[in-house]
């Protein structure tokens, strides 16, 4: 596999992990939980640390 494919697999795995963690941290309706988990998973390098910080308070 090329470097690009390794990076793509890493991004997809981290997106899935961020999706699952965000899903279990949120306490809203299922639609809102799915939407927030999907958006955080898709943009995890910027939004996942923010979601973790918000879950602390």
UniProtKB/Swiss-Prot annotation:
Presence of the UniProt keyword tRNA processing in the record: no
Keywords, comma-separated and alphabetical: Cell inner membrane, Cell membrane, Membrane, Stress response, Transmembrane, Transmembrane helix
InterPro entries for the chain: Toxin_GhoT/OrtT
Disruption-associated phenotype: Strongly represses cell swarming but no effect on cell swimming. Increased metabolic activity in the presence of TMP, an inhibitor of dihydrofolate reductase (folA) and sulfamethoxazole, an inhibitor of dihydropteroate synthetase (folC). Cells grow faster than wild-type in the presence of TMP.
Gene Ontology BP term (one): autolysis
Gene Ontology CC entries for this record: plasma membrane
Major subcellular site: membrane
Keyword Cell inner membrane: yes
TM spans (from-to): 6-26, 34-54
Mode of membrane association: Multi-pass membrane protein
Effect of residue 38 to R: Reduced toxicity
Entry's induction text: By conditions that induce the stringent response such as increased expression of RelA, heat shock at 43 degrees Celsius, probably under control of sigma factor E and/or H (rpoE, rpoH), or growth in the presence of trimethoprim (TMP), mupirocin or serine hydroxamate.
Subcellular localization(s) per the UniProt record: Cell inner membrane
Disulfide bonds: none
Source domain of life: Bacteria
Family assignment from sequence similarity: Belongs to the GhoT/OrtT toxin family.
Function according to Swiss-Prot or TrEMBL: Acts as an orphan toxin which is important for maintaining cell fitness during stress related to the stringent response (decreased amino acid, purine and thymidine availability). Overexpression inhibits cell growth and increases the formation of persister cells. Causes 99.9% of cells to undergo bacterial lysis within 2 hours after induction; nucleoids condense, the cytoplasm seems empty and the periplasmic space enlarges. The intracellular ATP level decreases about 27-fold suggesting the membrane potential may be disrupted.
Miscellaneous field: Although this protein has high homology to GhoT, the toxic component of a type IV toxin-antitoxin system, no antitoxin has been found. GhoS (the antitoxin for GhoT), YdcY (the neighboring gene), 5'- and 3'-UTRs as well as approximately 620 bp lengths of the BW25113 genome DNA were tested.
Protein name: Orphan toxin OrtT
Record gene name: ortT
């Amino acid at each position: 596999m090329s470097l690009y494919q390794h990076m793509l697999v890493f991004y997809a795995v981290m997106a899935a992990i961020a999706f699952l963690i965000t899903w279990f941290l949120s306490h809203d309706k299922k639609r809102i939980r799915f939407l927030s988990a999907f958006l955080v998973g898709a943009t995890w390098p910027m939004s996942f640390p923010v979601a973790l910080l918000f879950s602390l308070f």
